[in-house]
């Protein structure tokens, strides 16, 4: 089974144009520990510190002696011939001080063995070239497919694998390099066997014409590092459109392969057989969000079947290959904990032209491990009619999983409200369980009834499990304690709180590995007879997060804090439990955990904490990724908007900057609005002042190297208390939040009031355009990346708005900056990927918004990035985005030229620019990813 891995450069996402983190449940389904295979104790994903634990991953300049602001001014537009024709030609590079940070070599990814005695160092390359994105791809049913490799397109990869032994004292042994695969191989889906003696992974090698090679399955001996293909036949390839392969025992894998008899792909008819017809003559109510990359006709459906259909085979180390089951569009293969059964999920026709494949008819079957059919668990119909109201779900059985503390017991949930969150009913969800093969016709057993929406289960044993429920509309969340196999013990509520109230979050239970390779809640043994578990929490406080580990008595609710992060200089978190090699309760005095440690100036490192002395042993020693910014200034600041709501932001200042000597700086404000139900929750502090300032490839923090002050993530709370809809006062609250942020940086003397720029990505781009329309006095210019600007083009809801355009017409219109294009007078830079795959943010949104701006003489510029989707990945694209952004900031923020009459420059500046050299913008096709992420795929 696949082990999870730590993406060490968490910075790449933390500040790289991400929204405000979602509010977490009080005792959310626990963090998945390192080495956790797919058989998890939890049945739903949880927000966590380890959002970068993955199993397949993407992919030095000296300090200036000049003051940062002076250095930036001196460089000015040195990299650019400001003649407009020059600014319209080809891909460009940003200033060297930005290039050096972006081109820094990426850190490896770590993966621990099941027994935690070895560590993989998975090596990565830097940013991919545009040629990788330019490879042909099919956009089918919400999935983007590389037809040559028969996998998801644009899939990142590893370039090498190193193995280190983890010694008892925490030191690492010498590296053993996995070898034997072809030079230049692209490695994906790296997983450990359950005994930790072997690795499995896919290998592909690009052809000479730059087309993708197909994926072959390889295995490697961990002791020797020697790798070899699993299949003797060179004609057997992986089909990794959905699931790829899984260990069923220590010497056998179940593999999704391309059917040997598949033949050539279907050819598109030169003449259509008839018109494209969709019908609703039964008058069904079908409301769907703006999905992308959908099937368009029968040819698309045939092509989807061609690429997505797999033949399952059992492959052993001795070369034996046994096909099992018929070819089908298999989406999930999941062995039971005792390895005797397989739970097989597949999708089938009739397909849909209005929803992605995650809503296609879905069949779940139970097979023996040898491929013999036992019974059908469910066959769900096409789900085009899931209501758009938040917390609405699909009808029928959902979240079907193996119970991790039993050899072969299933559990699932069924809605009682027809999946419609607007229907009032009690109970709303019922959780069931039953044996894989029921005896004498026994019926499924009711495990628990819920009045809110089911949100997951954490299993421990026959006497303990935690069941979670939540309701987004009220932000209410509950955690129940149940005894799964003891009918005489009544369920009870352990926690009942608001998911917005991060200060009261008690943390998540830590998991331990069982002998079956599954993960369950870890029980800890003290001297008494009480039942203790470990709660791992982020420890939100008014001064910032102070993570903790509590020893929690599940019966009395009493707790003892046995570990807590340093508050003064460092930010530390608990990453995983390391002392789980044997079954049963863990003695507290033998506890061993993995922690991370970082500071404002020190990169994240990993440590072992060993009880009873709580000895700390450092495992890694990664260098600072951008030493030229090592002495930057970082501060979490608090301020207040005029209605009394407390706001927070992180202020960054360039190295060497002294406000008393250098004066106010140009400032870039980068943010993303969030919805709240209460003012108190909106004002709570999230994050830590001691976190390492990670800088991703498109992060606004890059402009610290250009002498800018950066106000990162100022809270923009859109509050709707009680029955009030937050978005009915969106513009008002957006403006007052931005006013408070701008006034605060000016009050502190670090930002010049006439040189404050604003920017954002996706919903942050939507925010940026609205601020330039409704608060032009605050900002000199704006940068809006991959946004949606006309909400009438997303009529069945967007973001967290679940009313339709016809139910909230005024709100849709007033929120749309497209409708206020005539009010935008400050310079605005629009950037969008030509192939945006995000729901709602079609490339057309930026194209039409630009035309509206141009039609009113607004100083504007549109950059369409060939082959890029919602986030940008190719080096050429990223460097050009940074060049465009730097040019915009230097010209309209640093120089203050945005005060120029926009009408006088409109005819020259409002040009459409393609990153390839001035081509017309291309409307992005619609896209939506499959509902569940592949194993081991970032």
Curated annotation (Swiss-Prot):
Q: Where is the composition biased (Low complexity)?
A: 58-76
Q: Which GO terms describe its molecular function?
A: serine-type endopeptidase activity
Any Gene Ontology CC annotation? chloroplast stroma
Subcellular location(s): the record lists: Plastid, Chloroplast stroma
**Disordered: annotated span:** 58-77, 897-938
Q: What is its EC number?
A: 3.4.21.-
Q: Which GO terms describe its biological process?
A: proteolysis
Biased composition (Polar residues) is annotated at: 897-913
Could you list this entry's UniProt keywords, alphabetically sorted.
Chloroplast, Hydrolase, Plastid, Protease, Serine protease, Transit peptide
Show the active-site residues: 762 (charge relay system), 836 (charge relay system), 870 (charge relay system)
Q: What is its main location?
A: plastid
The organelle transit peptide extends over: 1-54
Query: Which InterPro entries does the UniProt entry name for this protein?
Result: AB_hydrolase_fold, Peptidase_S9_cat
Family as reported in the entry's similarity comment: Belongs to the peptidase S9D family.
Per the entry, what this protein does is: Serine-type protease active in vitro against the LHCII N-terminal. Cleaves its substrate on the carboxy-side of Glu residues.
PANTHER family in the record, alphabetically? GLUTAMYL ENDOPEPTIDASE, CHLOROPLASTIC-RELATED (PTHR42776:SF28), SERINE PEPTIDASE S9 FAMILY MEMBER (PTHR42776)
- This chain's protein is named Probable glutamyl endopeptidase, chloroplastic
Q: Which organism is it from?
A: Oryza sativa subsp. japonica (Rice)
What is the gene name?
Answer: GEP
């Amino acid at each position: 089974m696949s082990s999870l891995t730590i993406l060490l450069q968490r910075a790449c996402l933390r500040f790289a144009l991400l929204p405000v983190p979602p509010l977490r449940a009080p005792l959310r389904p626990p963090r998945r520990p390192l080495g956790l295979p797919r058989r998890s104790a939890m049945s739903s994903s949880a927000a966590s510190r380890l959002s970068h634990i993955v199993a397949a991953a993407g992919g030095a300049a000296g300090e200036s002696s000049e003051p940062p602001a002076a250095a930036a001014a001196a460089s000015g537009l040195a990299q650019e011939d400001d003649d407009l024709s020059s600014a319209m030609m080809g891909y460009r590079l940003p200033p060297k001080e930005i290039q050096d940070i972006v081109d820094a070599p990426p850190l490896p990814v770590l993966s621990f063995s099941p027994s935690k005695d070895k560590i993989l160092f998975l090596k990565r390359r830097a940013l991919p070239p545009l040629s990788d994105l330019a490879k042909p791809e099919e956009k089918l049913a919400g999935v983007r497919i590389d037809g040559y490799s028969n996998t998801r397109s644009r899939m990142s990869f590893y370039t090498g694998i190193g193995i280190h032994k983890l010694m008892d004292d925490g030191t690492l042994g010498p590296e053993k390099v996995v070898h034997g695969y072809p030079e230049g191989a692209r490695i994906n889906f790296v997983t450990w066997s359950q005994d930790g003696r072997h690795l499995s992974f896919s290998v592909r090698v690009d052809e000479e014409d730059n087309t993708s090679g197909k994926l072959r399955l390889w295995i490697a001996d961990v002791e020797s590092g020697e790798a070899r293909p699993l299949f003797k036949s060179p004609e057997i390839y992986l089909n990794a459109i959905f699931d790829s392969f899984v260990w069923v025992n220590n010497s056998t894998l179940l593999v999704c392969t391309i059917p040997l008899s598949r033949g050539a792909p279907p050819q598109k008819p030169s003449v259509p057989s008839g018109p494209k017809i969709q019908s609703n003559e039964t008058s069904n109510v079908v409301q769907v969000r703006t999905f992308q990359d959908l099937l368009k006709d029968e040819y698309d459906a045939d092509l989807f079947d061609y690429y997505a259909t797999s033949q399952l085979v059992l492959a052993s180390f001795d070369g034996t290959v046994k096909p099992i089951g018929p070819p089908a569009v298999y989406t999930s293969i999941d062995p039971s904990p005792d390895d005797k059964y397989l739970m097989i999920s597949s999708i089938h026709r009739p397909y849909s032209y209005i929803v992605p494949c995650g809503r296609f008819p879905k069949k779940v079957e139970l097979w023996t491990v040898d491929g013999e059919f036992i019974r059908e668990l469910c066959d769900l119909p096409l789900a085009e009619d899931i209501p758009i109201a938040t917390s609405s779900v699909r009808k029928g059985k959902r979240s079907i999983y193996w119970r991790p503390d039993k050899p072969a017991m299933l559990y699932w949930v069924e809605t009682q409200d027809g999946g419609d969150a607007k229907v009032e009913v009690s109970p709303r969800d019922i959780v069931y369980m039953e044996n894989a093969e029921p005896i004498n016709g026994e019926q499924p057993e009711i495990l628990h009834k819920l009045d809110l929406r089911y949100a997951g289960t954490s299993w421990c044993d026959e006497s303990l499990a935690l069941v979670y429920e939540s309701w987004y509309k009220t932000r209410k969340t509950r955690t129940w304690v149940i005894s799964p196999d003891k009918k005489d013990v009544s369920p009870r509520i352990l926690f009942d709180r608001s998911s917005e109230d991060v200060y009261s979050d008690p943390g998540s239970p830590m998991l331990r590995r069982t002998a079956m390779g599954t993960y369950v809640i870890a029980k800890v043994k003290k001297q008494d007879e009480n039942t203790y578990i470990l709660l791992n929490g982020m420890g939100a406080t008014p001064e910032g997060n102070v993570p903790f580990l509590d020893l929690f008595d599940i019966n009395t609710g009493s707790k003892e804090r046995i570990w807590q992060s340093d508050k003064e200089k460092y930010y530390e978190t608990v990453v995983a439990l390391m002392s789980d090699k044997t079954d049963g309760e863990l003695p507290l005095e033998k506890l061993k955990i993995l922690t991370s440690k970082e500071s404002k100036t020190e990169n994240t490192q990993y440590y072992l904490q060993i009880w009873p002395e709580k000895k700390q042993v450092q495992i890694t020693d990664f260098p600072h990724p951008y030493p030229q910014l090592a002495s930057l200034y970082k501060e979490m600041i608090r301020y207040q908007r005029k209605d009394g709501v407390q706001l927070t932001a992180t202020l960054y200042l360039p190295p060497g900057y002294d406000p008393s000597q250098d004066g106010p700086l140009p400032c870039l404000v980068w943010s993303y609005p969030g919805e709240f139900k209460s003012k108190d929750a909106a004002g709570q502090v999230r994050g830590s002042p001691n976190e390492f300032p990670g800088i991703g490839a498109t992060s606004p923090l890059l402009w610290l190297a250009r002498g800018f002050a950066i106000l990162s993530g100022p809270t923009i709370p859109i509050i709707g208390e009680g029955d009030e809809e937050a978005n009915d006062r969106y513009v008002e609250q957006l403006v007052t939040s931005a006013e408070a942020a701008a006034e605060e940086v000016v009050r502190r003397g670090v930002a010049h009031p006439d040189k404050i720029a604003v920017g954002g990505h996706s919903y942050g781009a939507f925010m940026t355009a609205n601020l330039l329309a409704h608060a032009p006095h605050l900002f000199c210019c704006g940068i809006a990346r991959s946004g949606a600007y006309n909400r009438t083009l997303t009529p069945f809801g967007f973001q967290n708005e679940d009313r339709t355009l016809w139910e909230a017409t005024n709100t849709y219109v007033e929120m749309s900056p497209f409708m206020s294009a005539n009010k935008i007078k400050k310079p605005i830079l629009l950037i969008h990927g030509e192939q945006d795959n995000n729901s709602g943010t079609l490339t057309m949104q930026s194209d039409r918004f630009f035309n509206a701006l141009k039609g009113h003489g607004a100083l504007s510029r549109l950059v369409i990035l060939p082959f890029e989707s919602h986030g940008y990945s190719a080096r050429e694209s990223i460097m050009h985005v940074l060049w465009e952004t730097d040019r915009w900031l230097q010209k309209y923020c640093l120089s203050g030229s945005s005060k120029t009459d926009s009408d006088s420059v409109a005819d020259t500046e409002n040009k459409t620019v393609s990153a390839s050299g001035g081509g017309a913008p291309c409307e992005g096709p619609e896209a939506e990813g499959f509902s569940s992420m592949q194993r081991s795929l970032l």
